[in-house]
A protein has these predicted regions:
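N-terminal beta1-alpha1-beta2 module of alpha/beta enzyme domains
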Residues: 1-79, 83
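Internal, glycine-rich beta/alpha segment that forms the wall or movable "lid"
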Residues: 99-218
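Outer membrane beta-barrel
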Residues: 79-86, 92, 100-101
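Short, well-ordered coil/turn segments that N-cap beta-strands
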Residues: 1-3, 47-50, 80-85, 111-116, ...
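Active-site mouth loops of central-metabolism enzymes
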Residues: 18-34, 90-98, 145-146, 218
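Acidic, glycine-rich active-site loops and adjacent beta-strand->loop/helix elements
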Residues: 56-58, 64, 89-98, 121-125
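A cross-domain feature marking catalytic cores of carbohydrate-active enzymes
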Residues: 5-9, 55, 87-89, 115, ...
Length: 218
């Protein structure tokens, strides 16, 4: 059996949160970062398997200021040596799946193979509606369970996961889905340079792009 920790990244004590707008107070955020560093160092030394955190945005109230999962992962990683750093996780409705795969691969290198990944559908409507990558997407929760919005979100999520996994496993790929196409159909790179055709793959001498891949390889 393995044990891990999970945090929501709450910036204030109860009385500080109840004063309002705690998330906008730099001194509280700085204190939280310092405390997270101490938690990570202790958990690492105590032998915990991993330390997890979510992706949430626009949290002016201060309850869940995890923001960019990559930045928080690097903060945790910089204060630990052995345990996994786990994001729970990249919110599909707010992220480009190809870029997500690239971030995962890059972070795993930077963390020495210690990056753990979760992919999720997104349930906090306030920030998802402001960050979503496609207009037809919505956050999901009890208020819209088993509705068309829920079905679209689930269908999109399945494609998102498939693209992330395909990009991580493939040297290059051509993915034509319902929501995403990588590379875009009939795309010709206007930056005409022989480096693309001579030292890569998936591009012809006319700069027509038929395949694309992430770098580095995980």
């Amino acid at each position: 059996m393995k044990f891990g920790l999970f945090m929501y990244c709450t910036v204030g004590r109860r009385n500080e949160l109840e004063q309002g707008m705690a998330g906008r107070k730099p001194e509280l955020y700085q204190r939280m970062l310092s405390e997270i560093a101490q938690y990570a160092e202790f958990a690492d030394q105590a032998g915990y398997f991993g330390f997890g955190h979510p992706e949430h945005h626009l949290q002016i109230e201060g309850f869940e200021i995890s923001n960019d999962p990559c930045l928080m992962a690097m903060w945790l990683g910089s204060h630990s040596k052995k345990m996994k750093v786990i994001t729970c996780g990249f919110v599909s409705t707010a992220n480009n799946p190809l870029q997500t795969a690239e971030k995962i691969a890059t972070l795993d290198h930077m963390l020495g193979g210690r990056f753990g990944v979760g992919l999720v559908r997104g349930y906090q409507a306030r920030w998802v509606e402001n960050y979503k990558v496609l207009p037809e997407l919505s956050a999901v929760g009890p208020w819209n369970a088993k509705t068309e919005a829920d079905d679209i979100n689930r269908e999109y999520f399945a494609e998102f996961v498939d693209i992330v996994v395909t990009a991580l496993k493939s040297e290059t790929m051509n993915y034509q889905g319902k929501y995403w196409s990588f590379p875009p159909k009939d795309f010709v790179n206007p930056h005409d340079h022989p480096v693309y055709s001579n030292y890569g793959q998936g591009v012809d001498n006319n700069m027509a792009i038929s395949e694309i891949g992430i770098a580095p390889k995980p």
